[in-house]
Amino acid sequence: MLNHNIKYEWITLVREKWIVILLLLFFSITLFAVRNGNEKVEDRNLSITKEQEKVVKLDAEFTADIDSVTRKLKSPPKKSWLDPRSLSNIAWDAPRVVAMEAVPLALVSTGQSDLFTHYAKPKIYGEAYTLGFSELSNPVQLLFGSFDLAFVCIYLLPLLVLAFSYNILSADKESGVLKLTFSQPVSVYQWLLSKLALRYVILSSIVMISVVAALLFYGVSVADNFSAIAKLFALVLSYMLFWFLVAFVVNLFGKSSGNNAVTLVSVWVVMVLLIPSVISQLSNTLYPVPSRINMIHQYRVAEAEADKNANEILKTYYRDHPELAPKDTTKENQYAWILSYFASSELVNNSVKPILDKYDKALAKQQTWVDNLRFLSPAILLQNSLNDLAGTSTAHYADFRNQVIVFADVWKGYFKPRMFANEVMKAEEMKDIPKHTHNSENVRNHFASDLAGMIFFVFAILATSWTIYRKYTVAGILSI
């Protein structure tokens, strides 16, 4: 009986032509969403490439100028700060680009990428934590978010599922067909589950075909990224299954189509909109982040105080670091103007460290709060994992920020001892300047835990549906 039921359900769906319409509609939406994501990725890669090309050009110019001065083909400038061999010139004018390259699936989810910059250029002067890691963006766009594949899957796909499953039982009941159907030896539970299963298979196929086609159209290799795409489908299909089962439970109550629609939309609002908003707001309330403006202000105040006592601080610094003390005190160091900065920077950093630590701890607590409570909503689980797959999660940008700070110390560490030794740059040394390679392997991946959370929701809804069916059938409430 169930086989006949599925067969005739398929024939009915095909005759209504909604499968073709759904395929075209969802493919169009998916293609548009992936196009939007691809545009952002292309802009991101273009901006990084431009900065990297500037560095290559500057290196070539410095190398040529240094070689010309060294070989006396060109007279050295009278002022040291104009000399191409000056370490301070290279350290300030030709900083390396610390870039956060986009991963292949970055076009899937915008995540935090519209809030943070994807590259930084630490210099010899200034501290890395004072760099601007925030991107200048249209505030209206930030308010409404980005229409990407993640948005389609998290917000629109559940509505599509509910639209084609809210009245499966009620429509037949209202038309009088249901009594004829149940004159056959089949339970309402099996009958309804089989019809929803068919719709799930159809919609899942449409989703997978649309997503793969859109990714291929915009140059994402399925073979090279098979593992990531498989994870994407595992998450999205589990998310869809959850919403089909929610519709299954609501249909089991045997209410009218209008009642079902209102109930399902209410569940969507709570799960997709309300719970994530409440968690986000509570994280900001419970763990407020200190003002970044105040942190930079404190840094500048400490810097101004250090400037007043620069000479004394430098003498103390030489006592603490005798290896950097000048060996020939009769010769003036051409970098004297910046050596006092190096000496005072440690003092300044120590004065602002408590504020910086408080800032980092508050951010960490906020993220921990959200991570722990993400299991309250499958929408948060899906968003979290899609951001991980796209490399646009909060954790990815926090890791990038830390890498910038570490490389800033490496950059200074290369030039600082040489400046204290009053050295100059040689043409052949330009190739030995430190470079940075971004690596996000240390960023924690939440795929396994998020998928487990999604599966838990699926089994919880299944258990709820069976409990409701048994209870209502025994009580005689579930009437056909």
Where are each of the predicted segments found?
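Helix-loop-helix units of permease transmembrane domains in multi-pass membrane transporters
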Residues: 4-5, 14, 163-204, 472-479
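Secretory targeting signals
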Residues: 29-41, 54-60, 133, 139-148, ...
